[in-house]
UniProtKB/Swiss-Prot annotation:
Protein name per UniProt: 3-dehydroquinate dehydratase
Quaternary structure, from the entry: Homododecamer.
Record bears the keyword ATP-binding: no
Site entry (Transition state stabilizer), positions: 19
Catalytic activity: 3-dehydroquinate = 3-dehydroshikimate + H2O
Active site: 24, 101
Pathway listed: Metabolic intermediate biosynthesis; chorismate biosynthesis; chorismate from D-erythrose 4-phosphate and phosphoenolpyruvate: step 3/7
Transmembrane segments: none
Species this chain originates from: Sinorhizobium medicae (strain WSM419) (Ensifer medicae)
Length: 148
């Protein structure tokens, strides 16, 4: 059985494809999940892909992923700018975590420029639309190979 990467998605990402496609693109979260699963198969990983609009649920999943996966890709969405709880949960995890965003958070409103979780993760990928997820999977592949 292949090693598992968790792909966690924060609030409002369930509305992708309908919500501000000029910023987030036209792909739905189901489209992105299918892309991730196909790419992960090529990389030799299984994917556990989840989305929640609730911060506490995401924190619980981070703890679970820290125990059950070889790496985590997380699109925290708006919680990336506000969640000390997610920052602290990531600090407690020993597997690599990559933060990703569909849009370039640094080219948007000033309140989106700072990520509360960026100091706790291995790296941040933003601004490449749905491709940000694929780049995160490749980063995790590289990070897990380095740790062997």
């Amino acid at each position: 059985m292949a090693s598992t990467i968790f792909v966690l998605n924060g609030p409002n990402l369930n509305a992708l494809g309908k919500r501000e496609p000029g910023i987030y693109g036209g792909k739905t979260l189901a489209d992105i999940e299918a892309m991730c699963k196909a790419e992960a198969k090529l990389l030799g990983f299984d994917i556990d892909f989840r989305q929640s609009n609730h911060e506490g649920t995401l924190v619980d999943w981070l703890h679970e992923a820290g125990e059950k996966s070889v790496g985590i890709a997380i699109n925290p969405a708006a919680y990336g700018h506000t969640s000390i709880a997610m920052h602290d949960a990531i600090r407690a995890i020993t597997v690599p975590v990559v933060e990703l965003h569909l849009s370039n958070i640094h080219a948007r409103e000033e309140f989106r420029h700072k990520s509360m979780i960026a100091p706790a993760v291995k790296g941040v990928i933003c601004g490449f639309g749905a491709q940000s997820y694929i780049l995160a999977l490749h980063a995790l592949k590289n990070l897990t190979e380095k740790s062997k």
